[in-house]
Amino acid sequence: VSVKAPSLYPLKPCSSENTASVTLGCLVKDYFPDPVTVTWYSDSLNTSTMNFPSIGSDLKTTTSQMTSWGKSAKNFTCHVTHAPSTFVSDLTIRARPVNITKPTVDLLHSSCDPNAFHSTIQLYCFVYGHIQNDVSIHWLMDDRKIYETHAQNVLIKEEGKLASTYSRLNITQQQWMSESTFTCKVTSQGENYWAHTRRCSDDEPRGVITYLIPPSPLDLYENGTPKLTCLVLDLESEENITVTWVRERKKSIGSASQRSTKHHNATTSITSILPVDAKDWIEGEGYQCRVDHPHFPKPIVRSITKAPGKRSAPEVYVFLPPEEEEKDKRTLTCLIQNFFPEDISVQWLQDSKLIPKSQHSTTTPLKYNGSNQRFFIFSRLEVTKALWTQTKQFTCRVIHEALREPRKLERTISKSLGNTSLRPSQASM
């Protein structure tokens, strides 16, 4: 048999008995030849180890065991060295604490009635009976951590060695209606506990999808024609479908335009567009789109208001075409980052003249990983080599509500000048 490195497997009890100790093992399997060296590391001083002789005539197998005394969860590392194959590896095994105090975790939410105009929904995570000063609470949306400053943790009471705490998280109606799963993750005594929730179940017809789209910054601040769009997808036909609009303050509402489109998959979509007053929208007025049909168990209702949260102005950078690009074209890239909310408009100009939207492309806003709630996008403009070499100037213009008046920020680039300065200031409101 030729030299072969081992495989490592953790060994731990199937259940946590109410004993004063816990025993873990490290299985070292399918290696040749002897010997292997197994060493244990842990943050516990009260431990004992035992290494067993190897077995097997060809491929070898051995085990090593560690016993620890104490009531806290600990991480134990099995360090294995097999000199003949130069194999060195660590296997970390987490021991479940004995006599653990399991807290109770309840996740509740405020009213999720889509007929309500409130722009936020509150999630409450109650943790009862945890060890004092030994609890952390984190929020996740579809298993991704949510920006921590949106959460508020409050100690409710202390009873002897135990305490109770709750954490509150505000989310938008749009996040709630997206059917995402929200999770409260609680860590206590080194153990994790989860509670989950998602939007209230309702009687909306299966298959029919409805989106409510806010005004674009371009229409809101540049064109002065802000509008809401209610998009209804996957209908059998437009027959007997009604789309109506309602304002939160019950004031008069303008006339909406509506069109239907038949698609190749034999479904129909309806687009209803409602002009709104820019001042009303900026001040936080709420709107609803209601879609109904005689066969629906109840109307489909979508609500929208201006997104809550701290505003952050975008940073804009334009990049020169790559030198190795094909000889008959040049690609300009505009990076827009660190902005909130996600609603943003991007335009390209050539020598101060607007380039048609069909000639450039922009990604949808992407959210940063981790705790940052801000967004970034890329916009791409492809031009001919002739235009680029003629020292034409190309400008990436960004429109966003967090920018100072007139809510625009530009970055200009050309072959002869390179990157020019920003205009106007990118300072936030």
Swiss-Prot record:
The keyword RNA-binding does not apply. GO terms for cellular component: cytoplasm; extracellular region; IgE B cell receptor complex; late endosome membrane; lysosomal membrane; MHC class II protein complex; plasma membrane. CDD domains: IgC1_CH3_IgAGD_CH4_IgAEM (cd05768). Its main location: secreted. Keywords: Cell membrane, Disulfide bond, Immunoglobulin domain, Membrane, Repeat, Secreted. Pfam families: C1-set, ig. Residues 6-89, 103-201, 205-305, 314-414 form the Ig-like domain. GO terms for molecular function: immunoglobulin receptor binding; MHC class II protein complex binding; peptide antigen binding. It is found in: Secreted; Cell membrane. Disulfide bonds join C26-C78, C125-C184, C230-C289, C334-C396. The basic structural unit consists of two identical heavy chains and two identical light chains; disulfide-linked. N-terminal variable regions of the heavy and light chains form the antigen binding sites, whereas the C-terminal constant regions of the heavy chains interact with immune receptors to mediate effector functions. PANTHER family: TAPASIN. Constant region of immunoglobulin heavy chains. Immunoglobulins, also known as antibodies, are membrane-bound or secreted glycoproteins produced by B lymphocytes. In the recognition phase of humoral immunity, the membrane-bound immunoglobulins serve as receptors which, upon binding of a specific antigen, trigger the clonal expansion and differentiation of B lymphocytes into immunoglobulins-secreting plasma cells. Secreted immunoglobulins mediate the effector phase of humoral immunity, which results in the elimination of bound antigens. This is Immunoglobulin heavy constant epsilon.
